[in-house]
Design a protein with these regions (language model features):
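Substrate-binding clefts and catalytic carboxylate motifs of secreted carbohydrate-active enzymes
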Residues: 3-175
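Intrinsically disordered, low-complexity Pro/Gly/Ser/Thr-rich segments with frequent PxxP/GP/PP motifs
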Residues: 177-218
């Protein structure tokens, strides 16, 4: 997902410049839906032949790149654990696409972006490469994080710059709005807080309103 921020997500070139007519990212279905698709013996350890067939028999990303990315959260010992981590990855996968577009909306960011079409929202057949909801109409974490990223007034975090930006999709301006960033450690102790007052232009963005400084020992 960090490749979306760097704009290196595709060897075909830029994916978040101008108007993008087709963009998408997979999300692993929930473990209950995976169990509807295949026998338990093919779920874990992952049977690559079966998973690749259920990946559209073309991209084969779920048994390769997606699995490698899920393992960044630590090696899994069961399909239940793997599927749960897969939801985390799917969430940030979709969130990063929308928030990068937010940041670069029109003339406000590092590069001009006038829009993108997300392909696709649902699955037309049982697939391990699900989207916002799957063949059984079961929503994934991608749906909720997409909805969050596209709320009309949205504060968002840039994972590469450690900055917070605020997006306004309303056709009216908002003045003297306060954005607050807080960081908590693993024990839910607040270790950082900073705020900034922003004037949001109509259908515009205030980028890098504040910078989060993460404590070294967090």
């Amino acid at each position: 997902p960090m490749q979306h921020y760097e704009n290196t997500a595709s060897p075909r070139g830029s994916r978040v410049d101008g108007f993008n007519p087709e963009y998408g990212a997979p999300t692993l279905p929930t473990v209950e839906i995976l169990r509807e698709m295949m026998d338990e013996k093919d779920l874990w350890p992952i049977n690559k032949e079966v998973w690749d067939y259920l990946d559209g028999n073309g991209f084969h990303l779920m048994s390769t790149m997606y699995t490698d990315l899920v393992n960044n959260y630590g090696k899994s010992s069961s399909i239940d654990e793997f599927a749960q981590k897969g939801q985390l990855l799917g969430a940030i996968n979709s969130k990063s696409i929308w928030e990068v577009w937010n940041y670069n909306k029109l003339d406000y960011g590092d590069r001009f972006c006038s829009g993108l079409l997300f392909w696709y929202h649902n699955c037309s057949m049982p697939q391990v490469a699900s989207r916002m909801w799957d063949w059984s109409l079961e929503p994934t974490a991608s749906l909720y994080h997409t909805a969050n990223s596209l709320e009309p007034l949205h504060a968002q975090f840039d994972y590469l710059k450690n900055t917070v930006s605020v997006v306004n999709d309303y056709y009216r301006e908002f003045k003297n709005y306060k954005v607050i960033a807080q960081v908590y450690d693993i024990n839910s102790k607040k270790v950082f807080e900073e705020s900034a007052v922003v004037n949001l232009p109509s259908d515009g963005v205030v980028n890098d309103a504040l910078t989060i400084r993460f404590p070294e020992n967090i």
